[in-house]
């Protein structure tokens, strides 16, 4: 984001923006969109042991239990008779693939279905609760995947932190917890004058 003037207004937009405009964009709505019998939903709920899964999906993805599928490998090898002297190499690989299927489901299906859901979100263009508050020439840092700040308020040069659904070739970034990598972060914030 290029700021040409020290008095430029910066709007930081999160999911509250879409929700305030009547867009059903909470992760619990994504869960509902998947449906009760969705293989992806069942896999997420089985392998992510986090009570906040559907309220904080991005952070919950960091809690993906990779040990459980790995521990299932010996069981699958037995089920596919991969230890049998007459077993083929294909039996061994089939057992490994079956044990790792949950990880594959999450890493491959989740991005596709998430994008499809994001692309299905619509906004009523007559609902503009922020009319009169948005300043011309402002800059926008948008954590959403939707372009509603642009379509409703004419925002220009929006920086989409996690990607935008408008760019169909780009991947949307989902999941960003650093808690396993950063144990203690201390940041000194500068003091600002009013």
Task: List each model region and its residues.
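SIR2/sirtuin NAD+-dependent deacylase catalytic core
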Residues: 2-194
């Amino acid at each position: 984001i290029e700021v040409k003037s020290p008095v430029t207004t910066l709007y930081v937009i999160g999911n509250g923006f879409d929700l305030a405009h009547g867009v059903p964009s909470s992760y619990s709505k994504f869960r509902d969109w998947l449906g009760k019998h969705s293989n992806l939903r069942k896999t997420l709920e089985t392998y992510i042991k986090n009570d906040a899964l559907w309220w904080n999906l991005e952070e919950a993805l960091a809690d993906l239990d990779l040990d459980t599928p790995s521990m299932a490998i010996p069981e699958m090898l037995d089920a596919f008779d991969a230890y049998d002297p007459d077993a083929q190499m294909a039996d061994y690989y089939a057992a490994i693939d079956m044990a790792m299927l949950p990880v594959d489901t999450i890493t491959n299906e989740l991005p596709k279905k998430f994008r499809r859901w994001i692309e299905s979100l619509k906004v009523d263009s007559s609902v503009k609760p922020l009319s009169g508050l948005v300043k011309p020439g402002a800059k926008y840092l948008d954590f959403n995947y939707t372009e509603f700040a642009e379509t409703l308020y004419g925002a220009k040069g929006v920086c989409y932190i996690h990607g935008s659904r408008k760019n169909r070739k780009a991947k949307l970034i989902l999941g960003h917890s650093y808690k396993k990598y950063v144990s203690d972060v201390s940041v000194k914030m500068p003091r600002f004058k009013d």
